[in-house]
């Protein structure tokens, strides 16, 4: 596996990773209605191109076949909005390696605190990376009640 910066040609694959991850992995922790609100359809690939150009660092994990298998992003303020792994690559350490690279980027940029709003399946992952749970957030997404967890990690 190799981790590199996003390329425009990755956008379609990242959209598919997001959608399949939410539908399959998220579906193990949320109701069908919640999952459908979170990922009502395959996102437009342009969403990922825009994310890569809005000032955040967008990293992509490339599998043995040369195709993206996971991705994660880091904003200049320390916010990690996305870390998504294809269901086929889940549980193999890909997300951990991707997170470690995002943390390395954060440290080199002088970021002192990382924060996330972690989904139910991501909560345990972030706790293993040293994040502390701040609070559970209850909110509506596309009109459906859902929750996530506000978490943070001080970098020292």
Can you name each region flagged by the protein language model?
Residues 93:
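Conserved G/P- and acidic residue-centered "switch" motifs that form tight phosphate/ATP-binding loops
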Residues 55, 79, 112, 145-147:
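Exposed loop/turn and edge beta-strand positions of beta-sandwich/beta-sheet ligand-binding modules
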Residues 126-127, 131:
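Conserved active-site tyrosine of GNAT-family acetyltransferases
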Residues 5-8, 16-90, 99-101, 105, ...:
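Acetyl-CoA-dependent GNAT
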């Amino acid at each position: 596996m190799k981790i590199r910066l996003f390329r425009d040609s990755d956008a379609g694959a990242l959209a598919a990773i997001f959608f399949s991850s939410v539908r399959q992995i998220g579906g193990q922790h949320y109701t069908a209605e919640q999952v459908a609100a979170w990922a009502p359809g395959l996102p437009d690939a342009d969403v990922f191109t825009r994310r890569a150009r809005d000032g955040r660092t967008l990293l992509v994990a490339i599998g043995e076949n040369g195709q993206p298998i996971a991705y994660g992003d880091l904003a200049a303020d320390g916010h990690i909005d996305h870390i998504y792994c294809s269901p086929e690559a889940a549980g193999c350490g890909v997300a951990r390696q991707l997170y470690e690279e995002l943390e390395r980027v954060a440290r080199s940029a002088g970021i002192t605190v990382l924060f996330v709003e972690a989904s139910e399946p991501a909560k345990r992952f972030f706790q293993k990376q040293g994040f502390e749970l701040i609070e559970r957030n209850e909110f509506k997404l596309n009109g459906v009640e859902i929750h996530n967890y506000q978490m943070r990690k001080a970098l020292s």
